[in-house]
C-alpha cells in the first residue's frame, strides 16, 4: 500500500477529534535510530494539500517520561475557549498522567507551561 503522508517516529498517537491534527508521544520501550532516550510530545498538521511526504510539525515539547497511551479529548463547551482543541492526556511509563493544552502548544510552538501531573 502506498504511503500518503508520514512522520518517522516510534510513537503513541492520537487524532484531534474536530481538527486536522495528530499528536505523537515517544513510545515506551522503543529505540529510535539515534538511540536517544529522550521523551517528547509533538503535534503535526494533517496537510494533504502539499506535495511533501512529511507531515508538518507544529509544536514539540519535552515530556517527563515516555508514553504508554495518548488520548486527545473533545473541545470545551465554551466558544473561544482556551481549550478549544481539547486536552492531550498521556499515560506515562512511570505510572503518572501528564496533561497538555494543544492549543497553547500550537500557538507557542512548544509547551509554554509544564504538563499537569497526577
Q: Can you say where each PLM-predicted feature lies in the sequence?
A:
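WD40 beta-propeller repeat fold
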Residues: 1-118
